[in-house]
């Protein structure tokens, strides 16, 4: 324990943690009587708790079957007490379903399989007579929960959400009970949902490519197979195997609990013992390992990607895992090579010799790898770019770097670790990852601290050991992989008979007394110091309670809607130096100060982000001032921007999601859609570097908000910023560049054909007439949540849960500032991702829901509570609060925009929501747009025409090029 305290103290010194806030990093580790590991981290900076249950079982423990991932889905279906009105009567039907699935897995004859599937469908409908859909989610929401989710990786599975602190007893009861007696109910629908998830990954070009890379590297090892499993195995699930998986791995001795946030870590142990201590201890399973096989000889493997023009390759070397004795030295070595600013490989990019040369590492529990990414300039030879990159690796092996640069990179790693622990969610996720790796928090701290002791000899030694070894060269080849097809089985919908019902368990849980707490809202006067620096420049400073690292964000009120060329300007500024500093020299200077600088742009603003150490704030800002005042574009940096624009232009419609986003803009804004005003590659080339810099100069005359979070006082920051940033140039008044969503006089159906899409994406869009007060917008907010905001929403239950028509469903209200644009219309959209052969059924279903919305009082109450929970659980972190205040003030607010919302939400009724629906949505069916991205061969055009005039869109209709 003394050793751990010493190491923690040393780490805190290096990264500048404030002594009075050491508790934020303190993790209390304990073990319950059943062997369950518990990590507690108390942090009162935000009024919420992040809770996660970790199971040391993942895809490597059931390779290629998808069982771990299947079971993750099942864990939301309830228990013998949650999610059922009578488990004793439900159980025989569930047992029969399980037997049928086992029989299905052993049957190959198509006719016999079809008969078994129909039997499963009939049995599932009988079992549904006893099920209460989504009761677990409903109870989580009722007791302050939000962001409910889970994830399966190769090494572990975890279940998590955020909740309001006064409900910690209910959270512990619910999340322990769900693991004691889980029930495999409503499995038919969940099985098809997993099919839909498989479709989603298949349409993602990077996911498919990474699967090929992983399979090539690991061969027959468990890590070789995708987490979700093979299509063939997905079609043949065995519930008996899942039950065996649960009994083996879901035991106290193999599980962990992480709580991080606003609770008392010293007094919570009895509650945890009473709840999570009830899980069976079991025998901690002996898990297999999945090492990366030795790479004995260099080999080249082609990987298909449908990205034109660009050549690319990745050289993958075997490397140690995170806690191996060589891991930290290799981490430093790779940081020396590639850090995004001034590494040895970065120099090749900074000097325009190639589009990218970078190094990275990734680690699983049993295997590690290092990769070097090489992307030559357009039309240049990959072999030449590879040789230049390997030459930089040779420099590293030879020790051709200074002691100062080594120290700088070690400090950079420390800062990255410090930043990863700043907020409740980030820290909790780090705790989950460390716990699942089988190491203690003390070992994690020691491992981070060990970076400080890495020497130059250590770096050169590991570079020679790992980066001179044989590697696998993955070479990009233009093309796409064929997709295996999943077809819908023709099941009848399984609609539970007990929607809106409540189990006896839920009634008992309601007896636990709850302390009423008001939501914490942003106080513009207390949560930030606000001061004017010029006519239209405002400074916001927020105290950093954790460490002595600062963030400075400068947000100018000019984005791509005002000047589409700014996309290219942003790219240029991230790649140039000044009249006296090359990009590499600028990067070195920033790193020496422990700082970083980057530019970004969106539709309404152009931003400069600076991070660093507070003790170096003044020299850092002086360097930024030098860059802003003396930036200089060279021919190579301009060419890099042009090449990037060309590549992007050739890939505008490769991603189905990108096409969907463009269609949404087109549907909502017509010819005003930003994609129709994008700057073409030809125009970028014609601009040249000087014109791009001039465009940035014009940006700095716009209104700007400067947001600082750090340990310096407002007066100190004001003095330094006022002397280093061009705040006096910000004279143009703030402009709101958002547009009103447009109406449709008649229904229309837009279709963008994607012949190889395994999944169809579609959305509905309709304008909603103005809602001019908070009181009018409350029912709209409730309707949006009720329609598609969570697992108890209409879209989730009717489209995904009951009818297995989709994996992704949702809805969203698009609105402008109530203070600035009270008289502006709003818009309502619904979004669905569905298997291609289910498209017409899914469209028909969504249309019927919008025309005749099912009203359920219990689900309304859940939606209302979820809206309240968002207000309670979304108080921003210290890094976010300044930007939130700035944004709200620009939108006309003088106090938190959510002031009074929780009270009004609680008073709202289902009738209020129904009236909004009937007057704004149901009555609007003839003014709706339906937009579809998918394979037109899967569409029935005659049937589709019932929803409006069918218009096929082409690339030129959505993108200017």
Regions found by a protein language model. Give the residues of each.
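Positively charged n-region of N-terminal signal peptides that target proteins for export
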Residues: 1-4
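Hydrophobic h-region of N-terminal signal peptides that target proteins for export
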Residues: 10-18
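Proteolytic maturation boundary segments
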Residues: 19-37, 264-306, 311-312, 316-318, ...
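M16 family metallopeptidases and their MPP-like homologs
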Residues: 39-41, 46-61, 67-70, 84-177, ...
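A common structural junction motif
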Residues: 177-184, 275-283, 391-401, 625-635, ...
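Hydrophobic, small-residue-rich alpha-helical packing segments that form membrane-like cores
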Residues: 186-191, 207-208, 222-233, 239, ...
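Short, conserved secondary-structure transition motifs
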Residues: 195-203, 291-305, 410-421, 610-614, ...
